[in-house]
Amino acid sequence: GHLLKAQSIDHYSSLDPSQPIEFKGNCLRYADKEIILGPKTFFVDGQLSDREVADNPYVFNSFNKAAANFSAGTEAEPMIVYLAPYVYWIDDPDDPAIRVGKDGREPFGLVVKCPYLHIIGLNSHPENTVLASSRGQTQGAVGNFTMFDFWGDGLLVKDLTMGNFCIVDLEYPLKKELSRKKRMSAITQAHVAYCHGDKIVADNVHFISRLNMNPLNGAKRILFNNCHMESTDDALTGPGVYLDCTLQFYGQKPFWRSDMGGAVFLNWD
């Protein structure tokens, strides 16, 4: 079958032993819940070697490799990807090539066309599971580099950080070697994510950038629950409901526009 070799499982432990993940090859155990892996249930841990993931079609060591194998979810059966604590680079920050957009659009780190996609960190601290990029306008890109371009209704992101660390240091608490200094200190447009769809939810997610941060901009309706955002100007999503969120503004004008449905802030600071 598709079980990992026993020796690679025996020694498995996630980067945060205080919230253990038991990995048994074809299933996970986390927070007293058993998760059976399969065609619509993937597990990703950047610690795993290529050899360790080679024999398992549902286990990956990079988010991008997992994304290449997503199949469309439905409301009843979403496409779920579970992420162990790590820093997952959506775009290689060490690649010297300049990113250029196609068809008059911004350059993207990753375009994901998958309805009812659930991206879930296996740790209650969002800063421990990071989806990262480090490019912006004139900084490794022509145009406003945007880490993600999501297409599809029903996107859920939970218990993780989405950050464009072009002008913000990435300080990773669980393993110093995974931290990275910002690309530059001048403020430039460095986007996090666009989203084309409805019924989008972000739960306990940190969105980090500065100018034009764009946390899942473009959604018809989106709920941000218990999220934290750092940005300057023209950055927040217009038709969003922000519930129990913390917002750190480093500028005067956080919205570009909010006339598509109005933004609602409940119990935020």
Model-assigned labels for residue ranges:
Residues 58, 90, 95-96, 103-104, ...:
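Right-handed parallel beta-helix/beta-spiral solenoid domain characteristic of secreted/periplasmic
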Residues 52, 188-189:
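Surface-exposed cleft-lining segments at the edges of enzyme active sites
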